[in-house]
């Protein structure tokens, strides 16, 4: 079977009150259009056609790597007109699945079932399959009109509906599947004699009835699958539905969330056994948490891997890091891209790292900046240690070998190497390589000025 998918993404989204096209607004860290394209890809179609119009160049430039065929709708004349723009690129014998870019939570299983509905009869008597739903509040959506035998014979958009039709709870989702040959016959016959003055795709139902093409429907099991986004309130509602589903899936696999309503996932999160996640944590990109990991409150992890038994304390920010087993991080730590910790390392409060590689058992417990640095095993980094890695033009590396003890308030001016088991005295500024096994410090003589008086403020007149 040749499957062609059309995604409608040309709408202006006026009710978003935004300079950003509606389909680029984010849900769970990804644009709405990306959600729909990723779902469509799971059906293994022969092609995905995205119909763009309003803000089209912005959409294309923002999502340059989407595996789609872009089709321009120069004038936004309605959904039927939008689908018509893609038809020259689709063979007559292909099955066409029409989706909407602002309906991001449609499930692949539902779409697969709809495609199967459209194939149940001989292709010579092809079916028009519609995805429908029963909603308690169907406001704003097209209503399904059935005859006395329960057969669908029309869809009426709300702006064209009378009060009797508005009381109908069954709605059309905007998702349909049929042979391309049918659409190529029906779409040129659409009329714009309606309240919007547009060419509605829903009018193909009446044309299918006239042509005696069977119409079948599939009712979505979950109403959220067919919920569209037209304003920011609806975007927030679907965000919470997506997050709740993600939280439930994690808990089903053995993770504990302190409060599923205060958890945000903006990518992929893979958890081992007995993982604990406290409140207000944000996971972005791809995050892997090993067995027994604990994430404290108010943490942000982006593209991070944690080994077994790690603990990240409150208010820590980790990005682009690889952490081995049994490490402790935070509170208030910031680990930036390129940070790698071997097992049993500790990064304490108000420590920032970037391109820092720690070997086993190394600790930086307080108030330090460690950038472009290699640290050996069992190094102790004292409070207030700074690697001075930037000369205003280039970055330089610091190498700290095994067993080094660095006293508090030390500046290491890169490029510099500290030899194994060396000790650096507190308050030192190290500009040259430090020999192993020795104490190195920079001394400034302490001086006491006897009889010195503090300045006294004069009383103002």
Swiss-Prot record:
Record-listed Mg(2+) binding positions: 102, 230
Positions annotated as active site in the UniProt record: 366
GO molecular function terms attached to this record: glucosamine-1-phosphate N-acetyltransferase activity; magnesium ion binding; UDP-N-acetylglucosamine diphosphorylase activity
HAMAP family for the chain: GlmU
PANTHER family the record matches: BIFUNCTIONAL PROTEIN GLMU, NUCLEOTIDYL TRANSFERASE
Region annotated Pyrophosphorylase, chain positions: 1-232
CC cofactor note: Binds 1 Mg(2+) ion per subunit.
Catalytic activity, EC: 2.7.7.23, 2.3.1.157
N-acetyltransferase, as annotated region: 254-461
Cell membrane listed as a keyword: no
Protein's recorded name: Bifunctional protein GlmU
Binding positions for UDP-N-acetyl-alpha-D-glucosamine per the UniProt entry: 8-11, 22, 73, 78-79, 142, 157, 230, 336, 354, 369, 380
One protein family per Pfam: NTP_transf_3
Principal subcellular localisation of the protein: cytoplasm
Gene3D superfamilies per the UniProt record, alphabetical: Hexapeptide repeat proteins, Spore Coat Polysaccharide Biosynthesis Protein SpsA, Chain A
Region described as Linker: 233-253
The keyword Acyltransferase belongs to this UniProt entry's keyword annotation: yes
Pathway annotation from the record: Nucleotide-sugar biosynthesis; UDP-N-acetyl-alpha-D-glucosamine biosynthesis; N-acetyl-alpha-D-glucosamine 1-phosphate from alpha-D-glucosamine 6-phosphate (route II): step 2/2; Nucleotide-sugar biosynthesis; UDP-N-acetyl-alpha-D-glucosamine biosynthesis; UDP-N-acetyl-alpha-D-glucosamine from N-acetyl-alpha-D-glucosamine 1-phosphate: step 1/1; Bacterial outer membrane biogenesis; LPS lipid A biosynthesis
Residues noted as binding acetyl-CoA in the record, renumbered to the chain: 383, 389-390, 408, 426
């Amino acid at each position: 079977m040749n499957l062609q998918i059309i995604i409608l993404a040309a709408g202006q989204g006026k009710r978003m009150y935004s300079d950003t096209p509606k389909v680029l607004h984010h849900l769970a860290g990804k644009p709405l259009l990306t959600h729909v394209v990723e779902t469509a890809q799971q059906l293994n179609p022969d092609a995905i056609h995205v119909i763009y119009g309003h803000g089209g160049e912005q959409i294309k430039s923002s999502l340059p790597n989407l595996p789609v065929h872009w089709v321009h709708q120069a004038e936004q004349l309605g959904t039927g007109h939008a689908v018509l723009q893609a038809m020259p690129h689709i063979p007559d014998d292909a099955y066409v699945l029409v989706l909407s870019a602002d309906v991001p939570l449609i499930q692949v299983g539902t779409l697969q079932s709809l495609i199967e509905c459209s194939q149940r009869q001989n292709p010579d008597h092809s079916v028009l399959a519609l995805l429908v739903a029963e909603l308690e509040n169907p406001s704003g959506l097209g209503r399904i009109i059935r005859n006395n035998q329960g057969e669908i014979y029309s869809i009426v958009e709300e702006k064209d509906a009378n009060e009797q039709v508005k009381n109908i709870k069954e709605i059309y989702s905007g998702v349909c599947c049929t042979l391309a040959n049918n659409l190529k016959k029906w779409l040129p016959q659409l009329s714009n004699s309606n309240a919007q003055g547009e060419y509605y795709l829903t009018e193909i139902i009446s044309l299918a009835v006239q042509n005696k093409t069977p119409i079948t429907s599939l009712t979505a099991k979950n109403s959220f699958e067919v919920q569209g986004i037209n304003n920011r309130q609806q975007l927030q509602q679907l965000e919470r539905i997506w997050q709740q589903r993600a939280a439930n899936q994690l808990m089903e696999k053995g993770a504990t969330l302190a409060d599923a309503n205060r958890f945000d996932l903006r990518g992929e999160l893979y958890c081992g056994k007995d993982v604990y996640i406290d409140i207000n944590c944000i996971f972005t990109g791809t995050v892997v948490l090993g067995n027994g990991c604990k994430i404290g409150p108010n943490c942000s992890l982006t593209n991070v891997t944690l080994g077994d038994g790690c603990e990240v304390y409150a208010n820590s920010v980790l990005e682009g890091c690889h952490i081995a087993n049994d490490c402790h991080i935070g509170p208030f730590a910031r680990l930036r891209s390129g940070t790698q910790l071997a097992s049993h390392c500790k990064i304490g409060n108000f420590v920032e790292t970037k391109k820092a590689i720690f070997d086993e058992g190394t600790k930086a417990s307080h108030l330090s900046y460690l950038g472009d640095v290699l640290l050996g095993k069992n190094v102790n980094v004292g409070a207030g240690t700074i690697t001075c890695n930037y000369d205003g033009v280039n970055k330089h590396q610091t190498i700290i070998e095994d067993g080094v003890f660095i006293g508090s308030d030390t500046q290491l001016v890169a490029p510099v190497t500290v030899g194994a088991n060396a000790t650096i005295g507190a308050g030192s500024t190290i500009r040259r390589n430090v020999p192993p096994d020795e104490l190195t410090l920079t001394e400034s003589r302490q001086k006491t000025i006897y009889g010195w008086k503090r300045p006294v403020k004069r009383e103002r007149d």
